């Protein structure tokens, strides 16, 4: 199973990236959710503008699909500067990064997605650029090689990552601002779904937006993807208007249940409950039981189930929680 094949995957496709650009908020005033992040960034941005400085370097981390790229765009818009975008895997050589840095205007924002995937060679070039606004470049090879320094304009580096723990300490320590994005609350997702529906010219009730939000796994990217599929269903099977009933019918047809679980989530939980009496069960046995790789279970299926309290990791293996039993209407066994 490939994560990108799942309707409730938090990863983005190229087509979705293009479609989502039109409905992304442009300013902090339009930004929904993440209240602590929003209030802090308002102060940091206003203070930088009052001083006439570039904003401090910013690290944004958290699960995929929560709006790290959106926040980077908002920062650039609020500061009134250009945004240059790249990603860690694209910057293969030091010269790739040097080319981007030397083309920045004063106070511009350089956004590096997946910054945890920077190569050590590129990362070494980034240190003096972040700290001293200087670029150290080696000219020539062998005994004739020499280092030259190029002054850079003050700029803001925004790094985004889903794996903050994978960053090296020297890189992490050079960010003056660090923001963690959390999963969204249902009321905030409902607001996002309603806003997206209006941008798409859809007729959607508040209850319809709520139904989509409940099944979106706390993730705006998933909410917008589900909204597009509900729109398709409403246009073909009904008159295009989206009520709670129509949204529920569409999502049930797509095998996304009330908790936002898809077929694979339910298959894993039911395997633990039915085949292993609720667990504990070892990872290898569980992988064999559902026909998946253990890495798929660890990296793709488990995290959300554990976070939502449906699955436990114990020293003896995986166990279904009482909440998992109740989700399927099965009476949990008596605790000894």
Swiss-Prot record:
It is an enzyme of class 3 (hydrolase). DNA binds at residues 294, 313, 318. Residues 258-336 are annotated as: Head domain (RuvB-H). SMART domains: AAA. Residues 4-184 are annotated as: Large ATPase domain (RuvB-L). GO terms for cellular component: cytoplasm; Holliday junction resolvase complex. One of its GO terms (molecular function) is ATP binding. ATP binds at residues 23-24, 65, 68-70, 131-133, 174, 184, 221. Its main location: cytoplasm. GO terms for biological process: DNA recombination; DNA repair. Mg(2+) binds at residue 69. Residues 185-255 are annotated as: Small ATPAse domain (RuvB-S). Pfam families: AAA_lid_4, RuvB_C, RuvB_N. Keywords: ATP-binding, Cytoplasm, DNA damage, DNA recombination, DNA repair, DNA-binding, Hydrolase, Nucleotide-binding. Belongs to the RuvB family. Has 3 domains, the large (RuvB-L) and small ATPase (RuvB-S) domains and the C-terminal head (RuvB-H) domain. The head domain binds DNA, while the ATPase domains jointly bind ATP, ADP or are empty depending on the state of the subunit in the translocation cycle. During a single DNA translocation step the structure of each domain remains the same, but their relative positions change. The RuvA-RuvB-RuvC complex processes Holliday junction (HJ) DNA during genetic recombination and DNA repair, while the RuvA-RuvB complex plays an important role in the rescue of blocked DNA replication forks via replication fork reversal (RFR). RuvA specifically binds to HJ cruciform DNA, conferring on it an open structure. The RuvB hexamer acts as an ATP-dependent pump, pulling dsDNA into and through the RuvAB complex. RuvB forms 2 homohexamers on either side of HJ DNA bound by 1 or 2 RuvA tetramers; 4 subunits per hexamer contact DNA at a time. This is Holliday junction branch migration complex subunit RuvB. It comes from Salmonella newport (strain SL254). The lineage of its organism: Bacteria, Pseudomonadati, Pseudomonadota, Gammaproteobacteria, Enterobacterales. The gene is ruvB.
């Amino acid at each position: 199973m490939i994560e990108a094949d799942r309707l409730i995957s938090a990863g983005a496709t190229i087509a979705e990236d293009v479609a989502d650009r039109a409905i992304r908020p442009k300013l902090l005033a339009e930004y929904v959710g993440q209240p602590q992040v929003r209030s802090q960034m308002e102060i940091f941005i206003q203070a930088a503008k009052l001083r006439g400085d570039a904003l401090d370097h910013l690290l944004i981390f958290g699960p995929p699909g929560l709006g790290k790229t959106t926040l980077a765009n908002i920062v650039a818009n609020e500061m009134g500067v250009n945004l240059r975008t790249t990603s860690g895997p694209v910057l293969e050589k030091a010269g790739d990064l040097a080319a981007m840095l030397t083309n920045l205007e004063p106070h511009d924002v350089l956004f590096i997605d997946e910054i945890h995937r920077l190569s050590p060679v590129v990362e070494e070039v980034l240190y003096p650029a972040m700290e001293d606004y200087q670029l150290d470049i080696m000219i020539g090879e062998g005994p004739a090689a020499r280092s030259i320094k190029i002054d850079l304009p003050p700029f803001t580096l925004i790094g985004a990552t889903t794996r903050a723990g994978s960053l090296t300490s020297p890189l992490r320590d050079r960010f003056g601002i660090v923001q963690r994005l959390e999963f969204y609350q249902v009321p905030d997702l409902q607001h996002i779904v309603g806003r997206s529906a209006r941008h798409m010219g859809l007729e959607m009730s508040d209850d319809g937006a709520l139904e989509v939000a409940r099944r979106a796994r706390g993730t705006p990217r998933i909410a917008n993807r589900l909204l597009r599929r509900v729109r398709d269903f409403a246009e073909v099977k009904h008159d295009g208007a989206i009520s709670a009933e129509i949204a529920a019918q569409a999502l049930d047809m797509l095998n996304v249940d009330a908790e936002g679980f898809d077929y694979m989530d339910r298959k894993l939980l039911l395997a633990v409950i039915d085949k292993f009496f609720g667990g504990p069960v070892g990872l290898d046995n569980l992988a064999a039981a559902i026909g998946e790789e253990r890495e798929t279970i660890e990296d793709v299926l488990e995290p959300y189930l554990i976070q939502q309290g449906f699955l436990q990791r114990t020293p003896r293996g995986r166990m279904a929680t009482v909440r998992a039993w109740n989700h399927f209407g099965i009476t949990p066994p008596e605790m000894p």
